[in-house]
């Protein structure tokens, strides 16, 4: 399984670890993925891997 949000396509980013001596080494920032059940328009449910920020947006949109 890849570390990609199945709704927004948000994936890992690349950056640097920076030490106190300002030495830089590469690192990856991974999305905060959660597995949730989502009910589709036709009434069926599916398990999807969603970023936490996307889940927050979905909850906000569904409450309106």
UniProtKB/Swiss-Prot annotation:
GO terms for cellular component: ribonucleoprotein complex; ribosome. It comes from the Bacteria. GO terms for biological process: translation. SUPFAM superfamilies: L28p-like. Keywords: Ribonucleoprotein, Ribosomal protein. The keyword Ribonucleoprotein applies. Pfam families: Ribosomal_L28. One of its GO terms (molecular function) is structural constituent of ribosome. PANTHER family: 50S RIBOSOMAL PROTEIN L28, LARGE RIBOSOMAL SUBUNIT PROTEIN BL28A. Belongs to the bacterial ribosomal protein bL28 family. This is Large ribosomal subunit protein bL28. It comes from Campylobacter lari (strain RM2100 / D67 / ATCC BAA-1060).
């Amino acid at each position: 399984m890849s570390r990609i949000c199945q709704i927004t396509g948000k994936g890992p980013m690349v950056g640097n670890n920076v030490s106190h001596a300002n030495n830089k080494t590469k690192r990856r920032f991974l999305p905060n993925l959660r597995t949730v059940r989502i009910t589709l328009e036709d009434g069926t449910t599916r398990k999807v891997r969603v970023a936490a920020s996307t889940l927050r947006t979905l909850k906000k949109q569904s409450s309106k």
